[in-house]
Amino acid sequence: MDTSGKQAEAMALLAEAERKVKNSQSFFSGLFGGSSKIEEACEIYARAANMFKMAKNWSAAGNAFCQAAQLHLQLQSKHDAATCFVDAGNAFKKADPQEAINCLMRAIEIYTDMGRFTIAAKHHISIAEIYETELVDVEKAIAHYEQSADYYKGEESNSSANKCLLKVAGYAAQLEQYQKAIDIYEQVGTSAMDSPLLKYSAKDYFFKAALCHFCIDMLNAKLAVQKYEELFPAFSDSRECKLMKKLLEAHEEQNVDSYTESVKEYDSISRLDQWLTTMLLRIKKTIQGDEEDLR
């Protein structure tokens, strides 16, 4: 694709849009429908933005979408303005993550003002993902996942809310905010128990909650396992519960080999992900004479 040609076309469209805006501000335009010129300018800015996208000039595309959004606001077209801010955010994602967040936040402001909380929640997730992958700021990612969960809950979209909360719990545990993680895992685990479709995953949430308890204190973990078995009898027969009991026993005996062996055995059937590996290593370090490795 001829990107330089697309770039030149986009620049020409920008100039045309700017002329329309200027003309709309003249005295005669004010008398004879300046707003239709603004509408035309909105359209031309959006065309320019798409042309910049084809030329892979993401910042220029983002800026052109922002110009269109501002004009839509001038015309009181809130929905169109929000759509343009989202388009701007998506373009900036490829060039300037912080600017992408700023644009998505502008869109969220408009959507919440209009009472469109489900769509606002979706864009909070997009912001959280930028903080996770591009800007690597876990605290801010957590805040946006929490906000998203709040909006979803308010709209009775509980399964979407729980997905966001599980992200929060995972990061909270990594940041050693164990009680926060435990509260979420227990809450999501309890609600999963009552659903025929989600029942099977309840054991995983109780397992994760028990590991967080273990990171705080062994007695805590022991009591938690008992509580989960009473609450959800199917947990007793799960491989996760059996592993917890073996780990508690190994910890009580301060037996590193037994601890490592139990983890290896579990891992041979259900591969440990990064999160579980981190938690299990933290617990292992509290056993005397540990050798730093799980396998």
From Swiss-Prot:
Location of Phosphoserine modifications: 26, 29, 195
Keyword Cell membrane tagged: yes
GO BP: apical protein localization; brain development; intracellular protein transport; membrane fusion; neuron differentiation; positive regulation of ATP-dependent activity; protein-containing complex disassembly; regulation of synaptic vesicle priming
Keywords noted in UniProt: Acetylation, Cell membrane, ER-Golgi transport, Membrane, Phosphoprotein, Protein transport, Transport
Cellular component per GO, a single term: presynaptic active zone membrane
InterPro entries xref list: NSF_attach, TPR-like_helical_dom_sf
One Gene Ontology MF term: SNARE binding
N-acetylmethionine, modified sites: 1
Pfam family, one: SNAP
Location of the protein in the cell: Cell membrane
Entry membrane topology: Peripheral membrane protein
Keyword ATP-binding: no
Description of how the protein assembles with itself and partners: Interacts with PRKCABP, and disrupts the interaction between GRIA2 and PRKCABP, leading to the internalization of GRIA2. Found in a complex with VAMP8. Component of a SNARE-like complex that contains at least ZW10, USE1L, RINT1, STX18 and NAPA/SNAP-alpha. Interacts with VTI1A. Interacts with STX12. Interacts with GNA12 (via N-terminus); the interaction promotes CDH5 localization to plasma membrane.
Protein family per UniProt: Belongs to the SNAP family.
PANTHER family to which the protein is assigned, alphabetical: ALPHA-SOLUBLE NSF ATTACHMENT PROTEIN (PTHR13768:SF23), SOLUBLE NSF ATTACHMENT PROTEIN SNAP (PTHR13768)
Primary role: Required for vesicular transport between the endoplasmic reticulum and the Golgi apparatus. Together with GNA12 promotes CDH5 localization to plasma membrane.
Record-given protein name: Alpha-soluble NSF attachment protein
Protein's organism: Rattus norvegicus (Rat)
Organism placement in taxonomy: Eukaryota, Metazoa, Chordata, Craniata, Vertebrata
Protein's gene: Napa
